[in-house]
């Protein structure tokens, strides 16, 4: 046993309080392949050494409590305790550190994101010895990730279901988000799908309100999907939001969607909760439904640089819990997303193996083994002039979603959809011909607009629209 650590079983029980670092700070520890590793941004209270702060995080998120207890002698703390094994200062920040913590795999229930988060971030964030605490990243070992189903279907299976290859998928959120009747809502869905979109979407707060009950919305949207499919010869879908007040009601809505024969449903995974989300993901795999995930409430958790949890952790958790799409920012639109950081967690969503890369905020090498990938969804304040940048940034395996950028077209919903489809096809063709979309993107759009009056009108409406604010989420 290391001389720098001690357990109550080895030294005998002595009542009282002692420093966490005596037991939970273990700089000589060599991490195991089966450990869950965490990187915390720690801001200690004045006078608290970083080693004590890091050890406190390890203790309070695993086996520790505020005082010694005699029942510690009934177990093996060296087997079950979290360990702060490395601390490094944050460059350019005063009294701020990255504390690396290793957790033994046996601390966590198999297949439960809920249990994992309850342990790692459930209680320690209110600890008085810390001014602020942020979970920056997690390394999920294959021994744990293999206990999860993951996404219901994944990227390749979705493409096969939709018979759509070689380009990003195109979507639209129906607006106004609240207040439409079910029939008028279905009309907007039909017009957008008929104009060339692959998907339309319920907004995250469309559930089952007095102005539009869920069953009515589902029926009219299904009618719109089938009509648009018959007229275009393409497979279409609408993200029917199954989020509800109870898990039982959520599954009932998903069952009805399956009975209607539609291809995809939707869930607000943070407000709905990980237990509900995992249940829905299992139902979707068993019944052939794709699952679109909205991240409503994420900025409450991830936007502050010094406290909370980075979205890359929420993205990893979603891949484990299950979802085929998830909103991931745009880099260029109205919602938060710095390019390198955004592409870092986009790769964590899509790829099988991601190398450690601190320049993109990736603290650990992550091996997902054979877990299916998740399509990132770019949505929020984007329009046709953004299409070249979005195509270049996100690549083919993505969903580009234009709400106001479709329904705000001066000629109506269907022309708005036409404009976006023409712009996307032009950008994909230009890229495939070897043109540089980052440099020539505007010219590509101008050339395409000569052959599409719908695109020309969209270009005129949105030529001056920009969202130029400094990103909060930077390295």
Swiss-Prot record:
Entry-annotated residues carrying N6-carboxylysine: 201
Which GO biological process entries does UniProt record here?
photorespiration; reductive pentose-phosphate cycle
> GO cellular-component terms in the record?
chloroplast
**Alphabetical keyword list:** Acetylation, Calvin cycle, Carbon dioxide fixation, Chloroplast, Disulfide bond, Lyase, Magnesium, Metal-binding, Methylation, Monooxygenase, Oxidoreductase, Photorespiration, Photosynthesis, Plastid
The record places propeptide residues at 1-2
Instruction: Identify the EC number(s).
Output: 4.1.1.39
Binding of substrate occurs at: 123, 173, 177, 295, 327, 379
Q: What is this protein called?
A: Ribulose bisphosphate carboxylase large chain
The uppermost taxa in this organism's lineage are: Eukaryota, Viridiplantae, Streptophyta, Embryophyta, Tracheophyta
């Amino acid at each position: 046993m290391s001389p720098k650590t001690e357990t109550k079983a080895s030294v005998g029980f002595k009542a009282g309080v002692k420093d966490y670092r005596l037991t939970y700070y273990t700089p000589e520890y060599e991490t195991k392949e089966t450990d869950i590793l965490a990187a915390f941004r720690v801001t200690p209270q004045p006078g608290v050494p970083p080693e004590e702060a890091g050890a406190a995080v390890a203790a309070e998120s695993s086996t520790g409590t505020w005082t010694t207890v005699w029942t510690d002698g009934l177990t093996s703390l060296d087997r079950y305790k979290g360990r702060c094994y490395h601390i490094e200062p944050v460059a350019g920040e005063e009294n701020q550190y990255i504390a690396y913590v290793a957790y033994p795999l046996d601390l966590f229930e198999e297949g439960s994101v809920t249990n994992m988060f309850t342990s790692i971030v459930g209680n320690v964030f209110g600890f008085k010895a810390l001014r602020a605490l942020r979970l920056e990243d997690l390394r999920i070992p294959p021994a744990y990730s293999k206990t999860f189903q993951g996404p219901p279907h994944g990227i390749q299976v979705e493409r096969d279901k939709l018979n759509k290859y070689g380009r990003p998928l195109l979507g639209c959120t129906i607006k106004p988000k609240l207040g439409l009747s079910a029939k008028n809502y279905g009309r907007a869905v039909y017009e957008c799908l008929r104009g060339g979109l692959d998907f339309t979407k319920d907004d995250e707060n469309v559930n089952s309100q007095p102005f539009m009950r869920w069953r009515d919305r589902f029926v009219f949207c299904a009618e719109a999907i089938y009509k648009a499919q018959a007229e275009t010869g393409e497979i279409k879908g609408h993200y029917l939001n199954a989020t509800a007040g109870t898990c039982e009601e959520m599954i009932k809505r998903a069952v009805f969607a399956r009975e209607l024969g539609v291809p995809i449903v939707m869930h607000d995974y943070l407000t709905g909760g990980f237990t509900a989300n995992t249940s829905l993901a299992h139902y979707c795999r068993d019944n052939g439904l794709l699952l679109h995930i909205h991240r409503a409430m994420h900025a409450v958790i991830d936007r502050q640089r010094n406290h909370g949890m980075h979205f890359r952790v929420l993205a990893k958790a979603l891949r484990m819990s299950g979802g085929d799409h998830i909103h991931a920012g745009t880099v260029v639109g109205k919602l938060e997303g710095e390019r390198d950081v955004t592409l870092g967690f986009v790769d964590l969503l899509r790829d099988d193996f991601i190398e450690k890369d601190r320049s993109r905020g990736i603290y650990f090498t992550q091996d997902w083994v054979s877990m299916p990938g998740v399509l990132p969804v770019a949505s929020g304040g984007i329009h046709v002039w953004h299409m070249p940048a979005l195509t270049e940034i996100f690549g083919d395996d993505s969903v580009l979603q234009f709400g106001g950028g479709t329904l705000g077209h001066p000629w109506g919903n269907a022309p708005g959809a036409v404009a976006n489809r023409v712009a996307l096809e032009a950008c994909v063709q230009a890229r495939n011909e070897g043109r540089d979309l980052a440099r020539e993107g505007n010219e590509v759009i101008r050339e395409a607009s000569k052959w599409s009056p719908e695109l020309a009108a969209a270009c005129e409406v949105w030529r001056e629209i920009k969202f130029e604010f400094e990103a909060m989420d930077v390295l």
